[in-house]
């Protein structure tokens, strides 16, 4: 049964109660609240640049203040926070450079407050609102916002806000990542925006209500004060700017920042063809004991200067794997910001004037209340965010200048959560999540290789935590942390490698562990335009090993495989299993996807990869078609013969292949071009002009199709049957004329071939 989209549900109230809050085009704001809207239009360039950069630095100082006051691993090492500045009516001026999806849900919170709090209890100078309701605008319950209106002479001038992940806010699982919850009623406290600061005084009754459900109230109270300090700092800096330059000038700068961002965005869109771009990915295991796979669809439609994002075809909400409307929207905004708004200091408001989000409520990433959403940022939101990189990259590829901005899906595209708790070395209770997967990897570019352990692209300034700091804070001893050979997706440009962290308990008798993951059977970092997928997430667990004897003898292992012991297969939502001092636990996070056909990678680059232990000799041959001699050189004749033989094997063997000879009008992807023939617009191979069908066709239907196990795409991908029942496959689509690789896709064996690119003929005919 087809479920309706938001745009088709005209009689439904999207007010953040049952359905996620969808701000109307015109907000209903109480007349009690006076808004400062006057803005100077004539601002000299020097003043504009000074104030513009000052506002950016207000945001940076806001985030740094939270880090300094909190001092927690969440703020200092995970950088699981982000500040924002918004106009009086909730348009973004700036995102912060930390965890950017946190800002992506901020404008919905601010607009909801304007609509539902401006009358009662009112919005006044000296107030701040606390909020973590995902149906109003939060990633999940643990990401708490402190939202501060900034007033000037009795009028609401703008908003400064921040969001910070909290240690624990209740629920059935310590840390509040409730991987077995079936509804929000089993998760942490859920708070629609509530006035926690009134007249510059903390309301003790609201703070005590907020802290009561937490297992770590002291830590949450400290982080609340860190957020408070951040908002106060940002508010004071904005007021100082107003005092120096005047409210009209500062507001005028804000308006111009947004207007300039809009103009830059429109200029880019006008250079791109109209069309539809689709990405398909999968989530595994929505609750403990589940072996299912769940489809996640992203559709991007471009018509003129308007973009529309949809999720039609995504699986219905289920188990503990969901996200809300604001989470899905905020995730996509991160990719939109980084690929199309990076030159505007992450000011996405101008772009948002021309972007619509039209998901299907009741689905996995647009769930209705009271779905379980506490795991959203590490599962549902990541699987919503990362495919947007590929869809947007394919859209902008046709423009030679914008092609330089393309970035494939990065590492940790599904977070392999290792949630641990117990009593630490000081006999104090603790609970936390291993932050190491933040090290991620950056996807390949259209112009070069990705970045190994380069972080998560959703967090531009993220950093890998120090092993020593983790050991100091928690009762763990790391055995090693290393990059994983062959983990990056193969391609003309290789995706960045991911890494593996391995640890044992230290100065404690037992650690209670939970797993919470997806992307362990089906890779969630596929390549693009012929690039191969990266490795999956991997849990490795060995019981009763000889590690303590090795440590005593000063013989540290280089890998968990070096140890004697019992191998245990951990499931993706396994709860309350124990790790004792002789038990060794290793976690590998997914790497980044590759760009372009691996057979087109320079052989010398592959040799360097082998020298650097980025690629094994076997993978050099199997994936890249490069023969490495015993003394480490490239066997040039052997490499040419191997590559030519593979291309020849993938050509069409029966019948003649038509070649197009008309006008080549558009380079759609690295491997696909558009021709104008006498018979109309047709698609073709970029290498040999072999006919791949009319523009209205799915080009894949005209390719030679090969289907194989996922291990042929990446040697580190293991047996899917450990976790799921549906068989995933690696599909490849080759040119029938020359055997060149046109595109790949990862899919369940029974799923239809994806039409990932659909140019609109009217637009295509103009080019």
Task: Describe every region a protein language model picked out.
Residues 691, 738-741:
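Cys/His-rich metal-chelating microdomains
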Residues 660-680, 711-722:
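Short Cys/His-rich Zn2+-coordinating modules
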Residues 2-125, 133-152, 156-655:
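Glycine/proline-enriched, intrinsically flexible loops and inter-domain linkers
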Residues 360, 417, 757-766:
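Eukaryote-specific, cytoplasm-facing alpha-helical/coiled-coil scaffolding segments in long proteins
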Residues 128:
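Glycine-rich phosphate-binding loop of nucleotide-binding enzymes
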Residues 678, 682-713, 746-757, 761:
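Extended intrinsically disordered, low-complexity coil regions enriched in Ser, Thr, Gly, Ala
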Residues 679-680, 727-730:
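Flanking scaffold residues of small Cys/His-coordinated metal-binding clusters
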């Amino acid at each position: 049964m087809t479920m309706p989209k938001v745009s088709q549900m005209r009689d439904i109230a999207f007010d953040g109660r049952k359905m996620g809050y969808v701000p109307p085009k015109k907000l209903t704001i109480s007349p009690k609240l006076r808004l400062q809207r006057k803005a100077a239009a004539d601002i000299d360039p020097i003043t504009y640049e000074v104030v513009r950069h000052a506002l950016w630095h207000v945001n940076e100082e806001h985030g740094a203040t939270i880090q300094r006051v909190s001092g927690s691993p969440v703020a200092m090492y995970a950088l699981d926070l982000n500040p924002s500045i918004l106009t009086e009516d909730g348009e973004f001026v700036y995102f912060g450079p930390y965890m950017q999806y946190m800002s992506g849900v901020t404008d919905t919170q601010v607009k909801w407050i304007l609509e539902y709090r401006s009358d009662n209890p009112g919005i006044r100078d000296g107030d701040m609102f606390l909020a973590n309701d995902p149906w109003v605008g939060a990633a999940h319950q643990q990401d708490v916002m402190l939202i501060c209106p900034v007033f000037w002479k009795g009028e609401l001038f703008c908003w400064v806000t921040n969001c910070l992940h909290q240690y624990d806010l209740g629920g059935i699982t310590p840390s509040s990542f409730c991987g077995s919850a079936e509804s929000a009623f089993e998760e942490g406290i859920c708070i629609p925006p509530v006035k926690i600061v009134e007249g510059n005084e903390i309301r003790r009754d609201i703070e005590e209500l907020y802290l009561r459900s937490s297992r770590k109230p002291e830590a949450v109270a400290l982080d609340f004060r860190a957020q408070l300090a951040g908002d106060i700092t940002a508010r004071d800096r904005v007021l100082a700017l107003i005092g120096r330059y005047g409210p009209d000038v500062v507001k005028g700068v804000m308006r111009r920042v947004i207007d300039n961002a809009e103009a830059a965005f429109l200029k880019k869109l006008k250079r791109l063809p109209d069309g539809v771009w689709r990405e398909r990915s999968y989530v595994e295991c929505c609750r403990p004991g589940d072996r299912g796979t769940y489809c996640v669809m992203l559709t991007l439609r471009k018509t003129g200067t308007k973009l529309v994002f949809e999720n039609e075809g995504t699986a219905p909400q289920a188990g503990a794997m969901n996200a809300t409307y604001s989470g899905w929207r905020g995730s996509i905004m991160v990719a939109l910001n980084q690929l199309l708004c990076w030159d505007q200091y992450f000011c996405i408001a101008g772009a948002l004037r021309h972007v619509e989000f039209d998901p299907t409520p009741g689905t996995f990433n647009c769930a209705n209340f009271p779905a379980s959403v506490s795991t959203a940022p590490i599962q549902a939101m990541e699987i919503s965010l990362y495919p947007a990189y590929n869809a947007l990259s394919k859209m902008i590829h046709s423009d030679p200048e914008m092609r330089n901005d393309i970035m494939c899906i990065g590492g940790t595209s599904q977070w392999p959560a290792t949630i641990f708790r117990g009593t630490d070395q000081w006999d104090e209770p603790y609970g936390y999540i291993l932050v190491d997967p933040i090290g991620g990897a950056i996807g390949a570019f259209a112009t070069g290789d990705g970045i190994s352990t380069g972080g998560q692209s959703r967090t531009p300034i993220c950093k890998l935590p120090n092993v020593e700091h983790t050991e100091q804070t928690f009762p763990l001893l790391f055995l090693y942390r290393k990059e994983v050979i062959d983990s990056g997706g193969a391609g003309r440009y290789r995706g960045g490698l991911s890494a593996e962290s391995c640890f044992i308990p230290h100065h404690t008798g037992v650690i209670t562990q939970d797993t919470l993951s997806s992307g362990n059977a089906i890779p969630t970092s596929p390549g693009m335009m012929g690039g191969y997928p990266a490795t999956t997430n991997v849990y490795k667990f060995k019981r009763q090993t000889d590690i303590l004897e090795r440590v005593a003898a000063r013989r540290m292992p280089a890998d968990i495989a070096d140890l004697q012991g019992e191998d245990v297969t951990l499931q993706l939502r396994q709860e309350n299993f124990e790790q004792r001092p002789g038990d060794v636990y290793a976690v590998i996070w997914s790497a980044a996807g590759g760009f372009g056909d691996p057979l087109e990678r320079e052989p010398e680059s592959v040799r360097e990869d082998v020298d650097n232990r980025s690629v094994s000799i076997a993978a050099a041959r199997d994936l890249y078609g490069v023969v490495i001699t015993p003394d480490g050189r490239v066997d040039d004749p052997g490499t040419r013969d191997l590559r030519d033989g593979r291309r020849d094997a993938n050509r069409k063997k029966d019948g003649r292949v038509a070649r197009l000879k008309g006008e080549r009008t558009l380079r759609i992807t690295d491997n696909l071009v558009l021709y104008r023939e006498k018979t109309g617009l047709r698609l073709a191979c970029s290498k040999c002009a072999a006919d791949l069908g009319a523009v209205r066709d799915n080009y894949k239907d005209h390719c030679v199709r090969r289907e194989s196990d996922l291990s042929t795409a990446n040697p580190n991908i293991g047996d899917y049957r450990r976790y799921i029942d549906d068989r995933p496959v690696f599909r490849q689509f080759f040119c029938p004329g020359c055997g060149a690789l046109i595109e790949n896709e990862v899919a369940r064996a029974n799923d239809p071939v994806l039409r990932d690119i659909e140019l609109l003929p009217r637009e295509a005919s103009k080019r």
